[in-house]
Amino acid sequence: MDLLLLEKTLLGSFVAILVAILVSKLRGKRFKLPPGPLPVPVFGNWLQVGDDLNHRNLTDLAKKFGDILLLRMGQRNLVVVSSPELSKEVLHTQGVEFGSRTRNVVFDIFTGKGQDMVFTVYGEHWRKMRRIMTVPFFTNKVVQQYRYGWEEEAAQVVEDVKKNPGAATHGIVLRRRLQLMMYNNMYRIMFDRRFESEEDPLFNKLKALNGERSRLAQSFDYNYGDFIPILRPFLRGYLKICQEVKERRLQLFKDYFVDERKKLASTKNMCNEGLKCAIDHILDAQKKGEINEDNVLYIVENINVAAIETTLWSIEWGIAELVNHPEIQKKLRHELDTLLGPGHQITEPDTYKLPYLNAVVKETLRLRMAIPLLVPHMNLHDAKLGGFDIPAESKILVNAWWLANNPAHWKNPEEFRPERFLEEEAKVEANGNDFRYLPFGVGRRSCPGIILALPILGITLGRLVQNFELLPPPGQSKIDTSEKGGQFSLHILKHSTIVAKPRSF
């Protein structure tokens, strides 16, 4: 019976789509569309390009079709932009026109159909959420308030690694300890809380649920059902799992963090001057009626994924490149010892006077960009781009990884060479002052987390290189840096074992 119903549904949907296509051809506007592979009815280009739309596959398509190309993925138009000039149009010159976000069946679940800041459409709600989140998270005042905590967390990582007897011999998976550090860095800001160890049960619950959320959201496995509505019934099981994970996460955030902070606030009778952490500011906005409880939870949801995981990926990539390039690691260590003095542990203010460290961070973000396609943009209305018509509600992907790795724009881009940012690219910064290099995007929808990520990266990599010689495990000359690309993520495929030999000062 269920099979018969499914067959009828598929047949009816198929006929409806064919009719819609015919009507569209007869009545629709005549667009001058960007080039791309020839689509077929219903499926578009999906049968040709498949679900895996990672940055490297999209780069291959750009080499064939040009700096702007159109993929018809079922009912969705997907425009891929691969040049600095067109990226400037999307992100800056026409930032309002292309400033919205696309809908996605999985992200709709995890964000409550755009009740957060990152994935909401461009408009009043986005402006309100951005304003509410900026003061407690993304200002220099926040950096100065919490940088001592970041330094303490990095120091604790160093001590824990030194105490681990296996770290200096057969090696450890350093990422596990760094993950705890990143949770503590952000949970100090959010809730004035930290986790004592990797064995903390609440930390492990959070880590497991956030990891499952990332896996489900970043996978390409659900693209077919998102692109092609007649195939969506086959996604029911996947979407059910997403809904369950979302509900468990939000309940965890509410029970253990948001409600706990509310209780503390009620007992201390906090006034504005007494607000201690980000959630106090956000709950204050809720009390004023600016946002509701769901918005509060989705803000916490955003920070758990966007701030913690992306910075952790970049730290992990930076360590991997330093292990595989011992001469660069040695040069960085020499800078730290020379400019700071042996034994003087790097602090946040020190990061600004260490040019080679900053070059290492920039080069890591260039070659191993954590968000290689940025977060997708969308035009709410018909628009023009590069001399082509872009139909309303097209998904716009800026291939920021290719902008930063195109040999037409960069000298030997496949090489990990921090010196480029001290030599021919010395004026290029991570804040988007050059449209060839956009690790955090630029413009209205750029990532505000840059103000936190850069000092945390500098402090963490600096402390590790100051205190350890970082090496591949015995029997290996290098560690594996194979990539794992997602919907718009790029992390290392295998969490590597690292030998960390303590230095003596």
From Swiss-Prot:
EC number, as in UniProt: 1.14.14.91
Catalytically driven reaction(s): (E)-cinnamate + reduced [NADPH--hemoprotein reductase] + O2 = (E)-4-coumarate + oxidized [NADPH--hemoprotein reductase] + H2O + H(+)
Pfam families, sorted: p450
Compartment(s) of residence: Membrane
Record keywords, A-Z: Heme, Iron, Membrane, Metal-binding, Monooxygenase, Oxidoreductase, Transmembrane, Transmembrane helix
Record-annotated membrane-spanning stretches: 3-23
Residue numbers binding (E)-cinnamate: R213, S214, R215, L216, A217, Q218, A306
InterPro entries: Cyt_P450, Cyt_P450_CS, Cyt_P450_E_grp-I, Cyt_P450_sf
UniProt pathway: Phenylpropanoid metabolism; trans-4-coumarate biosynthesis; trans-4-coumarate from trans-cinnamate: step 1/1
Superkingdom in the source lineage: Eukaryota
Keyword Transmembrane helix: yes
CDD domains in alphabetical order: CYP73
Binding sites annotated in the UniProt record for heme: C447
GO molecular function terms attached to this record: heme binding; iron ion binding; trans-cinnamate 4-monooxygenase activity
Cofactor(s) named in the record: heme
Main subcellular location: membrane
Gene Ontology, cellular component aspect: membrane
Any GO BP: lignin metabolic process
Membrane topology term: Single-pass membrane protein
Homology family: Belongs to the cytochrome P450 family.
General function of this protein: Catalyzes the first oxidative step of the phenylpropanoid pathway in higher plants by transforming trans-cinnamate into p-coumarate. The compounds formed by this pathway are essential components for lignification, pollination, and defense against ultraviolet light, predators and pathogens.
Protein name: Trans-cinnamate 4-monooxygenase
Name of the coding gene: CYP73A13
